[in-house]
Amino acid sequence: MTENEGNDKKIEGSNPKKKLNVVTFTGAAGLLGLAVSFAIFTFKSHKQKSKKKGLPGCDTVCVNLSAKEILDLAEEIIHKSTRVHDAVALVSLDKLSYENVVLPLAELEARQLSLIQCCVFPKMLSPHDNVRKASTEAEQKIDAHILSCRKREDVYRIIKIYAAKGESISPEAKCYLQCLVRDFEDNGLNLTAIKREEVERLKYEIDELSLRYIQNLNEDSSCLFFTEDELAGLPLEFLQNLEKTQNKEFKLTLESRHVAAILELCKIAKTRKTVAMAYGKRCGDTNIPVLQRLVQSRHRLACVCGYAHFADYALDRRMSKTSMRVIRFLEDISSSLTDLAIREFSILEDLKRKEEGEIPFGVEDLLYYIKRVEELQFDLDFGDIRQYFPVNLVLSGIFKICQDLFGIKFEEVTEVDVWYHDIRAFAVFDSGSGKLLGYFYLDMFTREGKCNHSCVVALQNNALFSNGACQIPVALLIAQFAKDGSGEAVPLGFSDVVNLFHEFGHVVQHICNRASFARFSGLRVDPDFREIPSQLLENWCYESFTLKLISGYRQDITKPLVDEVCKTLKRWRYSFSALKSLQEILYCLFDQIIYSDDDADLLQLIRSLHPKVMIGLPVVEGTNPASCFPRAVIGSEATCYSRLWSEVYAADIFASKFGDGHPNLYAGLQFRDKVLAPGGGKEPMELLTNFLGREPSTQAFIASRTNYSL
């Protein structure tokens, strides 16, 4: 997701005016007029042409531009941005100041991000093909421009000289200045010309190798053939969707959805093992050499940039800071969960022995026997449970939880422009003062032309400007819920409910941020910290109080889930959680080790690591997951641990401050003020320590697994 910003109207109270204030700048602030006029006049022209209705007080957030408007706006963004950078580059060395070096770039960034989002988010959501194409083209142009700006030696020179002056500025401004310097140095501007060329070459090589690894996986056409008897346990609907050969065998591709179904539902051990072996062997001959070269190239890049290895290069600006700390974190959790994992495994092993005799238990049996035990231990019919979660009832329950927890209230905004007829918009207010905090859109249902994933996009970030104006945050929640043939929303599955809570946590995180700089606002925080608020909110999905609030039978919503089902869902949440956590830790450790040891043997590492972490279980015979582990290649290289990291600290926050499962307004307001409001302008560990009154701990995470063990 891409962040954004823009709007130079100061918002007061709960009745914002739609008219935009045009501010005249004089004296030292004259340079800032470039950035201000950038936001004002760009959008004035588009508003006058289209007369589209935006959110009150957010005139630079326009969500329904035509293809031509998108491309025209992209050109204006690039043109005005270039003017601001040119002006900074021309500041005389004897007149360098915060007002003419840092502030113009900060306010340009705050205002231009919302304009950029107006151009780029339609590629994910617009129902019009020409708009999606224009959006993609605009994004490519804007990305290229931003990269070129961060390679400008003339601007870097001015910023670096100003930074060296050590002028007294606020801590948040100092942090922003450091980020500006890093923007340029990430592109090698602090290196010699020879080293800079080496960085460029290595980055190109890394991109090429990463693409090749992923392409090899995408182009893999391996398939297997099974008789109906060999697929015993798979539902008829699944079999009907498989291609059938002339000799009545079913063709099974190695797509993850097919593999997951086999490993979880197939009763035949031999079939499970055959599928697991084939899946783990994918691209073994081609991708292992590619990954080896990729790891080496990333290590060389890190060394050129002054780091011991790539892991420390990747972690330098995250909560974890160093690879050593990540490995210690993973190993501590692993050792704390080992005894519980052994007990869990013995339950699975006993059931397999009863059903299949003395056939050794393999990794390929884990999913199947976890599901079998859960069927025996828990009286949960998730098909029936789905009937208790109508979309609007769940949504109103989430609003109520957040209102009681964070002291905010929601009001639907009607008669605003949207990109599709079922999009909804809401204003968020502080419950006490009535002050407008921000807005969010909901795009909840699948449709043709829409992206296929759930996320929250920041359409505009909070920011304060030198003229006293305040820019308020605007978020967009994208979900993938279904409608039936008559156009009615289908009730949510329980996993959908959890996902909606998670994503709404990001909305709250974005709206409640009050950082002065857009760079530190909303979702623009340390990646290790970003998921903590959402992981925290997920906890309420399993509390009886919440489940009663958000549930109601489809044909009679006055009938919520019964007490026993609510209690069982909480126990089910932690079933076999130790084994599941160890599996995740295994791959996190593999990712961390290959990027912190430039001489790691990819073939031997997983073979030695697997039984060590997985309480003696060896890797599936003949496989090497390194050949089909895309997370370690693109997107999470050296950072696979981050999801677990946030889950652990969210568990600590929930247990320490919200342990009874009911919304605690006092603790919620403290979390809002001490953790969400400051955003990325302060160290996340400092924020959490200040909120908890101590350093975060892993104990609550471990205890939650142990207390609800089978």
From Swiss-Prot:
Keyword Metal-binding: yes
Swiss-Prot/TrEMBL catalytic activity: Preferential cleavage of bonds with hydrophobic residues at P1, P2 and P3' and a small residue at P1' in substrates of 5 to 15 residues
Molecular function in Gene Ontology: metal ion binding; metalloendopeptidase activity
Enzyme Commission code(s) on record: 3.4.24.15
Positions that bind Zn(2+): H502, H506
Cofactor: Zn(2+)
Keywords: Cytoplasm, Hydrolase, Metal-binding, Metalloprotease, Protease, Zinc
GO CC annotation terms, alphabetical: cytoplasm
TM region positions: none
Cofactor note: Binds 1 zinc ion.
Enzyme class: hydrolase
Subcellular location(s) per record: Cytoplasm
Cited InterPro entries: MetalloPept_cat_dom_sf (IPR024079), Neurolysin/TOP_dom2 (IPR024077), Neurolysin/TOP_N (IPR024080), Pept_M3A_M3B (IPR045090), Pept_M3A_M3B_dom (IPR001567)
Catalytic site positions: E503
Stored Gene3D superfamilies: Collagenase (Catalytic Domain), Endopeptidase. Chain P, domain 1, Neurolysin, domain 3
Example GO BP: proteolysis
Protein family per UniProt: Belongs to the peptidase M3 family.
Protein purpose: Involved in cytoplasmic peptide degradation.
Protein name according to UniProt: Probable thimet oligopeptidase
Annotated organism of origin: Arabidopsis thaliana
Source organism phylogeny: Eukaryota, Viridiplantae, Streptophyta, Embryophyta, Tracheophyta
